């Protein structure tokens, strides 16, 4: 994913399918490293389904060589700019 596509899709909900057939990972695109192609996805957690009470989100770092396909899920609303700014603050402070 090039930097232009990353910026355009930032905050979009994506499903990543793996070359090795493991279960797909889903989440909102936070960033993509321009050198390695590593994706960073944010997966907000809901209280009903999580084993850890204090956790509100999960981050996935997915190496580009493990990715078979990236599928956008248009049925999910993208994160708004305020939410992205909050994650930016969390990850860069």
Swiss-Prot record:
The keyword Disulfide bond is annotated on this UniProt entry: no
Q: Which domain of life is it from?
A: Eukaryota
Provide the phenotype resulting from gene inactivation.
Answer: Inviable cell population.
Q: Which residues form the Sm domain?
A: 1-76
The record's keywords, sorted A to Z, are:
mRNA processing, mRNA splicing
Does this UniProt record's set of keywords contain Magnesium?
no
Query: PROSITE patterns attached here?
Result: SM
InterPro entries registered for this protein in UniProt: Sm
Mind listing the GO biological process terms from this record? Answer: spliceosomal snRNP assembly
Q: Name one GO molecular function term.
A: RNA binding
Q: Write out the GO cellular component annotations.
A: SMN complex
- Residues folding into a coiled coil are none
Q: What does this protein do?
A: The SMN complex catalyzes the assembly of small nuclear ribonucleoproteins (snRNPs), the building blocks of the spliceosome, and thereby plays an important role in the splicing of cellular pre-mRNAs. Most spliceosomal snRNPs contain a common set of Sm proteins smb1, smd1, smd2, smd3, sme1, smf1 and smg1 that assemble in a heptameric protein ring on the Sm site of the small nuclear RNA to form the core snRNP (Sm core). In the cytosol, the Sm proteins smd1, smd2, sme1, smf1 and smg1 (5Sm) are trapped in an inactive 6S pICln-Sm complex by the chaperone saf5.
Q: How does it assemble?
A: Part of the core SMN complex at least composed of smn1, yip11/gem2, gem6, gem7 and gem8. Interacts with gem7; the interaction is direct.
Stated name of the protein:
Uncharacterized protein new12
Its taxonomic path starts at: Eukaryota, Fungi, Dikarya, Ascomycota, Taphrinomycotina
This protein's encoding gene: gem6
């Amino acid at each position: 994913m090039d930097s232009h596509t990353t910026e355009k899709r930032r905050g979009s909900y994506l499903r990543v399918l793996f070359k090795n057939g493991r279960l797909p990972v889903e989440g909102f695109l936070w960033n993509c490293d321009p050198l390695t192609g590593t994706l960073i996805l944010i997966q907000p957690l809901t209280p009903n389904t999580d084993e850890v009470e204090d956790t509100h989100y999960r981050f996935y770092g997915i190496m580009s060589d493990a990715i078979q396909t990236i599928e956008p899920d248009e049925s999910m609303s993208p994160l708004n700019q305020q939410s992205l700014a909050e994650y930016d603050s969390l990850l860069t402070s």
